[in-house]
Curated annotation (Swiss-Prot):
GO terms for biological process: queuosine biosynthetic process; tRNA wobble guanine modification. It comes from Bacillus cereus (strain G9842). Keywords: Cytoplasm, Queuosine biosynthesis, S-adenosyl-L-methionine, Transferase. InterPro entries: QueA (IPR003699), QueA_dom1 (IPR042118), QueA_dom2 (IPR042119), QueA_sf (IPR036100). This is S-adenosylmethionine:tRNA ribosyltransferase-isomerase. Its EC number is 2.4.99.17. HAMAP family: QueA (MF_00113).
Length: 350
């Protein structure tokens, strides 16, 4: 399948550069995955689309301030490091710029020596394995010296770090936020609980592969990046109860979707406690096994994320919805507006 089938025209001014002042004031497009019918709402209207017995699945990963600026100890040359994945102990898979200046044995100093890293291995596309040394607690030092790794399409400076975290972020380890969750406030989540909507939590640590463009000409040639996920026994039991009682499982974001579909694929359609690495790639033709609905942002043209949404809601429906979003001047990408996709997605007054 040609990746150009997932292209659409997006004016640059529709790429949201800063978050809205209030999380829940973003707009919400509601898309019926069967008919392609569209409704234009505000995010707080999600209360009218979720019902008693439904379950929202939220990714409680927390974004690391994963971008570090340091200098080579021997020359003083500036080096930028992006933490991608913790391997063992203090060894990390990273991206460095400029990569040609960092070879095996190179020592990089951050914060006037408060944190140091030695290159212990190299990989393609600027990848380097670094081993860190420090006194104290690594994540406290990272919190002091690191910057939030905003996506490349965001040019503005983020004034408040917390706006690139969900209000329920807990498990540190992501290089990017699970952005569909950024629309929820604690008050909105409380209102959903009062209505009888269950909340279930999983963890998937988002990698930078999320932003890597598909370089292959066809979908089938593309290889997905792997990301770590975890689902507890408590969450699995809750989701199975919801299913047994006829409720809907609504995932918040493509990361929650990937987690549930990975587990269901690996366990004959069943949801159970599990953890591991997933490189699941969902595009049209994929049969969903776990979810009934999806809350997600508006994604990049030709990205694996728009392919996932197209697998769930039909490519023609999704591209029509995206073109409608452009016409109606929705805000796109990480700090942009949201979409709720489900069957028979109609507002109810209850």
């Amino acid at each position: 399948m040609d990746i150009n089938l997932f292209d659409f025209h997006l004016p640059e001014e529709l790429i949201a550069q800063v978050p809205l002042e209030d999380r829940e004031t973003s707009r919400l497009m509601v898309l019926d995955r069967e008919t392609g019918d569209i409704e234009h709402k505000h995010f707080t209207d999600i209360l009218s689309y979720l019902h008693e017995g439904d379950c929202l699945v939220l990714n409680e990963t927390k974004v690391m301030p994963a971008r570090l600026h340091g200098v080579k100890e021997d020359t003083g040359a500036h080096i930028e490091v992006l933490l991608l994945k913790q391997e063992e102990g203090d060894k990390w898979e990273t991206l460095v710029k400029p990569a040609k200046r960092v070879k095996e044995g190179t020592v990089i100093s951050f914060g006037e020596g408060k944190l140091k890293a030695t290159c212990t291995g190299t990989a393609d596309q600027g990848g380097r394995q670094l081993e860190f040394s420090y006194d104290g607690i690594f994540y406290e030092i990272l919190d002091e010296l690191g910057e939030m790794p905003l996506p490349p399409y965001i040019k503005e400076t983020l004034e408040d770090r917390d706006r690139y975290q969900t209000v329920y972020a807990k498990e540190i380890g992501s290089a990017a936020a699970p952005t569909a969750g950024l629309h929820f406030t604690e008050e909105l989540l409380e209102k959903l609980k009062q209505k009888g909507v269950q909340l279930a939590f999983i963890t998937l640590h988002v990698g930078l592969g999320t932003f890597r463009p598909v370089s292959a000409d066809t979908i089938e040639e593309h290889h997905m990046h792997a990301e770590y996920y975890h689902m507890s026994e408590e969450t699995a039991a809750l989701l199975n109860r919801v299913k047994e009682n006829g409720g809907r499982i609504i995932t918040v974001g493509t990361t929650s979707t990937r987690t549930l579909e990975t587990i269901a694929t690996d366990h004959n359609g069943k949801l159970c406690a599990a953890s591991g690495w997933t490189d699941i790639f969902m595009y049209p033709g994929y049969e969903f096994k776990a979810i009934d609905g999806l809350i997600t942002n508006f994604h990049l043209p030709k990205s694996t994320l728009i392919m996932l949404v197209s697998a769930f809601a039909n490519r023609d429906n999704v591209l029509h919805a995206y073109n409608e979003a452009v016409k109606e001047k929705y805000r796109f990408f990480s700090f942009g507006d949201a979409m709720f996709v489900a069957s028979h997605a109609k507002m109810r007054n209850k």
